[in-house]
Amino acid sequence: MKYCLKYTNICTKLNKADEISIKYIEDKGLVDFMEKFSSQRIILRVEATYFPESEIRKLIAIKKTYPDYRFAVAMGGYVQELGRTLREAGIDFFESTPCTDWERFNYLIKEGVSDINLSGPLAFDLGNVHRVLNILNPTVQVRVTPNSCMRLNPNTDPLIGFFIRPEDVEVYEGLVDVLEFEGLEHQDTFYSIYAEQKMFIGNLNQCIYGFNKPIDNKGLISLFGERRKTCGQQCLKGGLCHRCYDLASLAKPMGDRAREKILETIKAEQEKVKSSEN
């Protein structure tokens, strides 16, 4: 698993990151920055929709010396002029906004993005994402933001939103390539929790942005992440799976018998899901 940290003056773990993300500003010491972090990939965040030809020529020249950089472009769902200009110049780029549906996923891959930023339903269907990428372009990197709970309606239960607990990072190995954190001022903290400690003691709403529900993280067992990576959000499709809710119930203080009963329910649920898939 690779880790991308957003650059700030207060971030002390930049040298440990595989990638460093920084807002792109023309003629603002880009070469010096790349030289300082020459062993890491640089992600240049840009909101512009157009670069003058002189800027493109400069970027092409920089790439000869520092080839491992790419642009994260705010495209609004479509590859606008800037994206096509970068592609034609041989400069890697991807969309900064998370992709959540298959139509947009296929569109972006065919437009030549180097990475694809996932959330929503696609992030619950990573087995199929991996399969399709192997067909369309296996070099594309999958990126996610693990510490942000994304869902359309913030008032719905956060358990239906996509996020990854620090304890579940290993579960996503081979399906996700890069983790990039929300929270500009707390990049050090999240790198420590996810990459070094690989655990968090406390309520999930203390480490996951947008998770507005107090669930004791240490009470969740490993089945939580294992199922979510490929569940396809069956709970929203009238399916039989409600494992997230059952496992969250286990995180609450309860007697041994109550815990056994919930585990029995989960096991029975697993058998129903397996039989429905056969």
Identify what each model region corresponds to.
Residues 1-278:
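Active-site pocket-lining/capping segments in soluble small-molecule metabolic enzymes
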